[in-house]
Amino acid sequence: MKIVLPGGSGQVGTLLARDFHARGHDVTVLSRRPGPAPWRTLAWNGESAGAWWQVVDGADVVINLAGRSVNCRYHDRNREEILHSRIASTRAVGEAIAAAGKPPAVWLQAGTATIYAEREDADNDEETGQIDGLGKGRWGFSTEVALRWEAALANAPTPQTRKVTLRSAMTMSPDRGGVFDVLLGLVRRGLGGRAGTGRQ
């Protein structure tokens, strides 16, 4: 398969690219800072058209993982970057797919499980999950990002491409630089322990 990974130079994208490449797939990672890799890497700015549109045309699947890291302080500038980077990159991918002569069959779009309200009485899923009301919970900004991010995907004019939102939470991997690495460092410094009620 021909697989394109916008924003695929982060931890999750690297894990996917490594696995797809090992299985013999044709992998292209789109990155703001492309570096050496066993697969093809192309530069993109996450916002506008460019040479990268050519690899989207004829791809079997696009997996968009682009977005500024949320591992930061949530001051106004970072909040704006978190929101803008997700919406702009989603729109850019949608424009590339819409312009393709042979659009991909599937567009997998990163999303976030923080769209759901915190609850202990039932599980949240796509069918019955309770969406957190904006401003009602502690995670109002995260919910706003999630809703606007998904709206950008839904509004993309790509009728020949099936669109799927991946409402994922933190992805744990033993690789350096990921959330597991950060949490493990805290535990090693004696700062581990139960998070919240421990019943999450």
Give residue spans per PLM region.
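N-terminal Rossmann NAD(P)H-binding glycine-rich loop of SDR-like oxidoreductase domains
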Residues: 3-23
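Rossmann-fold NAD(P)-dependent oxidoreductase module
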Residues: 15, 19, 96, 152
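Conserved glycine-rich Rossmann-like NAD(P)H-binding loop of the short-chain dehydrogenase/reductase
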Residues: 25-32
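Conserved Rossmann-fold NAD(P)-dependent oxidoreductase catalytic core, especially the SDR/UDP-sugar
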Residues: 91-137
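NAD(P)-dependent short-chain dehydrogenase/reductase
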Residues: 121, 156-157, 162-200
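Active-site Tyr-X1-5-Lys
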Residues: 134-163
